[in-house]
């Protein structure tokens, strides 16, 4: 029973350090940054933007 208790304590310590370490990935500049929306028109505008950037061969679709 003593080995199981030690194993549970070690697992809890490892999990808590892993959870605390995940917050360190956030850079100060990224925290204050405004997300850039390249396609404010939604999915259809995103498709048109993709077709336009890739030199779309379908003239009616490319706008």
Curated annotation (Swiss-Prot):
The modification Cysteine amide is found at residue 62. The keyword Secreted applies. The keyword Disulfide bond applies. Belongs to the O2 superfamily. Contryphan family. Keywords: Amidation, D-amino acid, Disulfide bond, Hydroxylation, Ion channel impairing toxin, Neurotoxin, Secreted, Signal, Toxin. Expressed by the venom duct. The cysteine framework is C-C. This is Contryphan-Bu. The lineage of its organism: Eukaryota, Metazoa, Spiralia, Lophotrochozoa, Mollusca. The modification 4-hydroxyproline is found at residue 57.
């Amino acid at each position: 029973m003593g080995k199981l208790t030690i194993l549970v304590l070690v697992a809890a310590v490892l999990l808590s350090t892993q959870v605390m370490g995940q917050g360190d990935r956030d850079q100060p500049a990224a925290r204050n940054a405004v997300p850039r929306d390249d396609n404010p028109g939604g999915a259809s505008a995103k498709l048109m933007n993709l077709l336009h950037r890739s030199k779309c061969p379908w003239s009616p679709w490319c706008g």
